Structures are given as C-alpha cells and as structure tokens.
C-alpha cells in the first residue's frame, strides 16, 4: 500500500463569529467588556479583542495576565487575578453571552450563497469555535434559522485543548470522514484559528476584513475609503504574519477563488506543510 497525495480538497473547516456569522466579531468582544465591568474592572473593546480565537476561559485568563488589566483588578480586590477569579468572571460571562448572542447572529452578507457553491463543488463543511458547547448550541440554532447548517460542529470544550492546538480541526477530520488533512482548508479570522489549522497540517485562509482584526460592522467596512482599506489590510496582514496563513482574503466570499487555487496546487503535488 502506497501513500498518494490528495489531488483536491474534500472539506472546508470554518470558524463561526467573524467568518460565517457576526461581521466584525462583536458578540464575544462586547460581552467580555460587560463581564469584567460587573467586577468593577474596566476593559476596552480593543483590549478584549486581543486574544480572540482562544477558548473563552483561556481568553479571560490571557486578559487577566495583561499587566494593565491585572493592575486594575488589584486596585479593586487587593490582588492580581487567580484562576478562581478567572472562573468567576467566566461564570458571569457565560449567561451574558447566551442571553445576548442573538443580537449578533446575522450571517455575513453573501456567505450562504458562497457556502452553497462550495457544497455544490463537493466540499464538506466542518466548523469549530472558541465558544463552549452551551453557547454554540444557541449559535447553531440561530444560524439554522438563517439557512446555514454546517456538516459538523466542534465547540472549544469538546476537545482536550482548544485553539491554537489542532484538536478541534482534527475532530472535524474524523467526524467528516476525510482521508487526509492536506485535503482540508481551515478558514478563520484570528491568529489562534490559523495556528490551529497550521498545526493540523491543513491549508489555511485568514480573513482580513470580516472579523476581529478589523472589528467593523459590514456597513463600516463598506464605508472605508480605498486608502483606509488598503492601510488596514497592510496592518492586519502584519498581525497574521507570524501564523503563516497560506492565503489572506477580505471575507468568506473570496474563498471560491482560493479553493480553485488550492485544488490546482494539490493537482501539481503541492502540500500545505511545504509552504
């Protein structure tokens, strides 16, 4: 029995917020701010966006390790945040997130048509998220009401390790019956999500304008001048540079051209691990 390189993609494994739903990834960001505020600790939207893509407990732990935020916490409680304190913030974050997730549940404009086209081309649609299952269940329900149903969903607490570890992406490979990780493309708007795909041995596509890095609504994105948009693209490309995505595109609507190019490269014998 011999190993043969895959010659075309079999699956796209997609993030959720900032990738398929919630243009600008506002749902988790705003709730982090509100959860910390309930402990009288101020966290800005920009600070809250920093670790986006990680599991939510890890996200809060990372925020609490930021020296400026740790100092604000110390001024209120007389100590820097422990893991128990992180859990307390997380336990407040969760019901707030579930309560308000519907506010930011709209599909990214054009995403449904794009994904329909990918399926017509034979791709399976896997998915994973930094949300835990209790939140993902609500996100999935709301997306279905808007016409989007992924073939598989993996929440951050359904594997031993969340992003940037590869476990969630690999769980999709197993569930979808994919025979080679190189026949998968991971699409995400965050650095941890791209690292997840890289570590899983997949092709990776970073979304520059629809997610956390740009942090604008669809209307705000559309209103950017050509000069400002190009400046923001350059800034965000630099943010992703260390995670080495194979492709960077504005939104998921640019994905079909990337899929075609990956299939061309696979047919030539190229593999994602080599680039």
UniProtKB/Swiss-Prot annotation:
EC numbers, comma separated: 3.11.1.1
One Gene Ontology MF term: phosphonoacetaldehyde hydrolase activity
CDD domains tied to this protein: HAD_PHN (cd02586)
Gene3D superfamilies: HAD superfamily/HAD-like (3.40.50.1000), Putative phosphatase, domain 2 (1.10.150.240)
Cofactor binding remark: Binds 1 Mg(2+) ion per subunit.
Co-factor(s): Mg(2+)
InterPro entries referenced in this protein's UniProt entry, alphabetically: HAD-like_hydrolase_sf, HAD-like_sf, HAD-SF_hydro_IA, HAD_sf, PGP-like_dom2, Phosphonoacetald_hydro
GO biological process: DNA repair; organic phosphonate catabolic process
Catalytic activity field: phosphonoacetaldehyde + H2O = acetaldehyde + phosphate + H(+)
Keyword Nucleus in record: no
Cellular component, GO annotation: cytosol
Recorded family membership: Belongs to the HAD-like hydrolase superfamily. PhnX family.
HAMAP family xref list: PhnX
Function: Involved in phosphonate degradation.
Assembly and binders: Homodimer.
Protein name as catalogued: Phosphonoacetaldehyde hydrolase
């Amino acid at each position: 029995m011999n190993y043969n390189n895959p010659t075309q993609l079999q699956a796209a494994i997609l993030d959720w917020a900032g990738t398929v739903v919630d243009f600008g990834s506002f749902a988790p960001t705003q709730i982090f701010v509100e959860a910390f505020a309930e402990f009288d600790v101020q966290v800005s939207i920009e600070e809250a966006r920093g670790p986006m893509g990680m599991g939510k407990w890890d996200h809060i732990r990372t925020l609490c390790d930021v020296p400026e935020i740790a100092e604000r916490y110390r001024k209120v409680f007389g100590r820097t945040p422990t893991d128990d304190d992180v859990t307390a913030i997380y336990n407040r974050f969760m019901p707030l997130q579930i309560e308000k997730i519907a506010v930011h549940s709209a599909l990214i404009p054009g995403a449904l048509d794009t994904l329909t086209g990918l399926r017509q081309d034979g791709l399976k649609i896997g998915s994973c998220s930094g949300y835990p299952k209790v939140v993902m269940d609500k996100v999935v329900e709301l997306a279905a009401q808007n016409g989007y149903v992924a073939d598989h969903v993996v929440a951050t607490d359904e594997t031993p390790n969340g992003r940037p570890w590869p476990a969630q992406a690999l769980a999709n490979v197993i569930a979808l019956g994919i025979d080679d990780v190189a026949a998968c493309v991971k699409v995400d708007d965050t650095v941890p999500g791209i690292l997840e795909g890289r570590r899983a041995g997949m092709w990776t596509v970073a979304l520059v304008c629809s997610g956390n890095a740009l942090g604008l609504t669809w209307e705000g994105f559309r209103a950017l001048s050509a000069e400002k948009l190009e400046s923001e693209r350059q800034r965000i490309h630099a943010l992703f540079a260390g995670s080495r995505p194979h492709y960077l595109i504005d939104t998921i609507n640019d994905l079909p051209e990337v899929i075609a190019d990956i299939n061309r490269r696979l047919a030539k014998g190229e593999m994602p691990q080599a680039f």
